[in-house]
Amino acid sequence: MSSAAAAPETAKALDRRSRKLAREVDAMEFAPPTAYVSDPLVYARKTAEAYLTRFAKPRPRALLLGMNPGPYGMAQTGVPFGEVSIVRDWMGIEGKVGSPDPVHPKRPIEGFDCARSEVSGRRLWGWAEERFGTPEAFFERMVVWNYCPLVFMEASGKIRTPEKLFADEREPLFQACDDALREVVGILRPGMIVGVG
C-alpha cells in the first residue's frame, strides 16, 4: 500500500489514539501549585483532527516529539508547536477553537485570534518552511507529535512543565503518555524519533 493510500487509515488511527489519551489524562487530578489544566485535544479537537487528517502519513523518516503544548501554540490551535500564523497561513488549517473550563484569566484561549507568538513553534515550523518549502514536502518526511497533551498552570499563570509535577501525579500521567507514544510509533513506524523543544 502506498503512503498516500495508507495516510487516511494512519490519520484515523492517530485520531483514535489521541482521543483515548485525552480521556485518560483528563480523568487525572493535579494538586497545587497546579491550579489550571487544559487539554487542546478536547477544546481544539476540530483543528487537531484537521492536522492529523491532512498531514499524518505512515513511515515518516522522523517523528519529531515535543513535550507538551505551549500557551501560545498548541494551546491556541490544537496543532503541536502550533504557532498561529504558520498553522493558518502555511499549513492552511484554521477553525473555531473552544475553550477549557475553567480557563485561566491570564491565559485566555483566543484560538486563531491569538496575537502572541509561540517561540518554539515559530522556530520549528519556520525551519520546516525554509528547509522544505511546502507543508506537503515536510510531512512526506516528518510527523510532529506532543508526548503529553496537557497544559499545566499555577494560580499566577506560570506554566508548569510535566516534570515539575509531584511524583504521584507524574507517574500515572507518564504511564498514559508512554502507552500512547508506543502505539503512535507502532502506527507511524518512523525511521527515528527526535525530541524537540
Describe the function of each predicted region.
Residues 8-192:
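A polyanion-binding, active-site-adjacent surface
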Residues 1-9:
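Basic/polar N-terminal segments that are highly enriched at the extreme N-terminus
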